[in-house]
Amino acid sequence: MRYLSVAEITRLWGISARGVRSYCAQGRVPGAFLTGKTWSIPADARKPTRLNGRRVAPTPLLARLREEMSARTSGGIYHKVQVELTYNSSHMEGSRLTRDQTRLIFETSTISPQGEGVRVDHIISHAGEALSESLLKDLHRTLKASTSDSGRDWFAVGDYKLLPNEVGGRETTAPENVAREVRGLISSYEANRAPTLEDIVSFHVSFERIHPFQDGNGRVGRLVMFKECLRHGIVPFVIGDDTKFFYYRGLSRWDVERGWLMGTCLSAQDSFKGWLDYYRIPYSG
């Protein structure tokens, strides 16, 4: 995909650079992502239409995350989320980086344009958007671009899997059926205008069982849960590496005992509430 700068989009859309950045920061330009303080915008992106009536204001948490992301603030909740999401999710997939090493990566900005920080920025920027296939694929593309997998023709970075895969010894959806099942899952989920935490977790379970991408499904799925909590005003959570046994067991036993996974997520949510209390960010629930 070809990306354009804010200046180039300004000329195409006929609006100010400030207006372009505002649309991007509000998550209204699908596929746009922030690297440092520079927006990269898909060349085929369409100018968002004006919103009529009053807009729903972002929660205090989302507003703070976007403010600190824009300013690249260190030491606040944005920095905390970057480090904890990256450290825990990567460790669950086999990374050996320590938490201090992960923190140092962000504090010294030693990350690539397609690195961990971009993925966290992506879900913050697009938190207000409805779920879509393109959003899931964009998230997978930012996850896998610039990795060894991106050089493999059969891997399909940013697209659905070409080869069958399994998770935890369990068969997943066949490649030829993935698009249909993902569309059905999204359609069913989006029909609920006020999803609960359990609805979001249930979507995650179904997504993991489809396992639409060749690899990276767990990380994409956990980022989507975080995004959806932000979107619907629910306190988000980070699944800790130290609770991955309960998380994976909860995924496998969801049909017979939802308490395993819900308990793990609620415990993680309580920990996140502790961070919000520390940073003096109000929340509901």
Put a short name on every predicted segment.
Residues M1-V29, F33-G285:
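FIC/Doc superfamily catalytic core
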